[in-house]
Amino acid sequence: MTDKDLIDKNRTETTQTINMEDRKIRVAITHGDTNGIGYELIFKAFSEPEMLELCTPIIYGSPKIAAYHRKAMDLQANFSIINNATDAQDGRVNMLTCIDGEVKVELGTPTKESGDAALKALDKAMTDFRSQHFDVLVTCPAYAQTMNAENYSYKGLKSYAETSIGEGAKGVKMMINESVRIALATDGLAIKDIAANITIDNILDKVRKLHNSMKRDFRISNPRIAVLALNPNVNGTEEKEVLIPAINETNIY
């Protein structure tokens, strides 16, 4: 690579960084179960003017269903209908149509129809995610038992996202507030199965993913990560045989 190539490469990377910092974060929001509280949460959240100053929302849902909820709740909520995520405009609540045809709304009662609508919105959002049309995905509440499609059994958002992204992608379930981020080493397991899943490879994977997320997503240049012991008073063997060796092997401190 010549000096000119290096200069051009650096200039391009700098321009991309500036563009990312200049534009607002694009937040995709799926409407969840159409008989639930998804649209109420969306409309009330974006009734605050400062929300549109923070981000550009793209609602994956249905204008007809949104209008039904708006009328039922007697809310003053405006949205702009778009055909593609790339058409989203800053300063507006952008509504991307994911549902063809009519969907019966029965407020407060999850149905197969409302579950299908939730899954269709998720499917469309994940397709756009793979095309990098938005920066972050927020999902409104849905009822997992009604979100099963033909040849597919919905087992929660984390599992769904991993399957949708493919390529062996594995996520980390996290709980976050303003001061702390907690990542789970295991989730969805019976108590009797937890210890067997506390392995060096698993701990290494979770710690490294958490470390990368702290730097990339939260702009923490030198994250400090605490790994919690498994046993009360460290009275087992997992700490000595698994946790401490995994920490020593991370090479991130």
Each language-model region and where it sits:
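Asp/Glu-rich intrinsically disordered low-complexity tracts
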Residues: 3-15
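Anion-binding alpha/beta catalytic cores of soluble intermediary-metabolism enzymes, centered on
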Residues: 3, 17-253
